[in-house]
A protein has these predicted regions:
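Active-site-adjacent loop/tail segments of enzyme domains
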Residues: 10-18, 22
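Short acidic-hydrophobic, aromatic-tinged amphipathic segments that line or gate anion-handling sites
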Residues: 13, 66-68, 179-182
Length: 201
């Protein structure tokens, strides 16, 4: 049977991305930005961004990232924008991002890496899971979610059942109904093995 994939893009407009970026620059001078466009394969990085990142952050070599002017980075609607700062801790950068007053237009979160992830309002993991369930005809009560980062919070709260990993951030621990062993202990596999009585290799 032919497989089908259901994709719905909810893009952040150039105007919104530009407004947020410039407000954040006012609040945290020196912030560097990257935008992810098209199907997620196109990265537009500001000059100086690559020096702040590693392969693990985006699954690509920093040396392969372009060094663009900010106007070029912000040119065109994007799936997501990433912001990072050479000196400020991520908690401080997040606090300054929250102070710019655009919560009605953007969603700002973190994933455990030293960078902010900014998307259009309503673009969260729970909205993606909800779309997938609608497409597949799966009831929300039949879903189970696992997470460890701040960007998992909405999904953990939305799912019919949810587990935060033992190494999760406090927000994720508070949002989940249960705890799972840590990522290092293969916590997801341990939980999944229990009801089905089999080993996940």
């Amino acid at each position: 049977r032919q497989r089908q994939m259901c994709i719905r893009d909810r893009l952040m407009s150039t105007a919104v991305a530009s407004e947020f970026a410039h407000r954040l620059l006012d609040a945290a001078p020196g912030t560097r930005f990257l935008t992810i466009k098209d199907d997620g394969s196109t990265f537009a990085s500001q000059r100086g961004y690559a020096e702040l990142t590693t392969f693990a952050d985006h699954s690509r070599e920093p040396s392969d990232m372009p060094a663009l002017d900010l106007d070029e980075v912000l040119d065109g609607d994007c799936l997501k924008m990433v912001a990072r700062h050479p000196d400020l801790p991520i908690e401080e950068l997040a606090a300054r991002a929250a102070s710019v007053g655009m919560a009605d237009e953007v969603h700002v979160t973190t994933s455990g890496k030293p960078m902010l992830e900014i998307s259009a309002r309503g673009v969260t993991k729970d909205s993606g899971l909800s779309m997938l369930c609608d497409h597949l005809g799966i009831d929300r009560t039949d879903t189970v979610a696992f997470g460890d980062g701040a960007n998992d919070v909405e999904m953990l709260a939305w799912a019919g059942d949810s587990y935060a990993m033992a190494n999760a951030v406090p927000l994720a621990l508070a949002a989940a109904r249960h705890r799972a062993p840590s990522n290092a202990e293969d916590g997801v596999a341990q939980v999944v093995e229990q009801p089905v009585g089999m080993k996940v290799l």
